[in-house]
């Protein structure tokens, strides 16, 4: 990874929830390159350990810790383990999140006759699936913040970054739970920024647009490599006309927000990184 922005994070302890995920693993690599000790919190420990080993092989310092961000006892145990291994947390990236098909609709629009049709409409959304998405994204941001922000109180240069989405501004069709959860993240980021403003903790968020990754490749491209119909709609609604580069264009924004020389007066904001998607009216 070639970083164009490289703040000095030596001596800092960075905690990344969902750290072995497709996007958050890029944050882990970037943080380690900047000199931070990185705690990779991941529900599947083996994935976190594989990433930590990769970081160490490249000269960085990282350890993996098992953590279910929706379970307070699991989060507390992870916090204690990180304290014992690395010391107090300086940087928290609340990266754990995701969607669940049980919380989706099959169609973009509800039409006459859909009640009787063999399709999943708004009225068929599974309650437990909806709760799962809200818990994973919103409660999964609340609980780690409650645990790790305690380490930051009254200390210089401590920062929390939440992961929102362009869904937070205008919800995408078919995914109401995920869109609602990310809208809540924007509001919560503002609340936290005000709440912690007197004790030296900055709180911001990034709102990624569409990035082509292995995780979403099947949704964006057909087996022959041609774009799906949904990809065509996405790119048509993205003024820059392309997908983002997670290595450069997400990690760069995160490192900027972590840079206390450049961003020390920035708190309570959510930065869209979406090629203009959230700004475009469609005409």
Which residues fall in each region the model found?
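Catalytic Tyr-x(3-8)-Lys segment
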Residues: 124, 128, 226-248
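Alpha-helical segment proximal to the catalytic Tyr-Lys
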Residues: 150, 194-195
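Residue(s) in the substrate-gating loop at a strand-loop-helix junction
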Residues: 165
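Active-site helix of classical SDR
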Residues: 145, 181
């Amino acid at each position: 990874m070639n970083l164009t922005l490289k703040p000095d994070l030596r001596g800092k302890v960075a905690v990344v929830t969902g750290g072995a995920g497709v996007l958050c693993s890029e944050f882990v690599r970037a943080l380690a390159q900047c000199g931070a000790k990185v705690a990779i919190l991941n529900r599947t420990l083996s994935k976190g350990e594989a990433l930590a080993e990769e970081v160490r092989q490249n000269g960085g310092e990282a350890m993996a810790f098992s953590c279910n961000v929706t379970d307070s006892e699991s989060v507390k145990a992870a916090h204690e383990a990180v304290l014992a291994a690395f010391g107090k947390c300086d940087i928290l990236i609340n990266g754990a999140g995701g969607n669940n098909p049980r919380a989706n609709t099959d169609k973009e629009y509800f039409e006459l006759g859909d009640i009787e049709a063999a399709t999943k409409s708004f009225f068929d959304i599974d309650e437990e699936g909806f709760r799962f998405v809200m818990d994973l994204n919103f409660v999964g941001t609340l609980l780690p913040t409650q645990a790790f922000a305690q380490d930051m109180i009254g200390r210089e240069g401590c920062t929390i970054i939440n992961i929102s989405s362009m869904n937070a501004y205008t919800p995408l069709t078919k995914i109401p739970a995920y869109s609602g959860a990310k809208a809540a993240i924007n509001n919560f980021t503002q609340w936290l920024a005000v709440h912690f403003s007197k004790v030296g903790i900055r709180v911001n968020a990034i709102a990624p647009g569409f990035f082509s990754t292995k995780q979403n490749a099947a949704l964006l491209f057909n087996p022959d490599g041609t774009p799906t119909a949904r990809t065509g709609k996405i790119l048509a609604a993205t003024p820059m006309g392309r997908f983002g580069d997670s290595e450069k264009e997400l990690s760069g924004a995160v490192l900027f927000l972590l840079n206390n020389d450049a961003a020390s007066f920035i708190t309570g904001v959510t930065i869209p990184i979406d090629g203009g998607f959230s700004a475009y009216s469609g005409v």
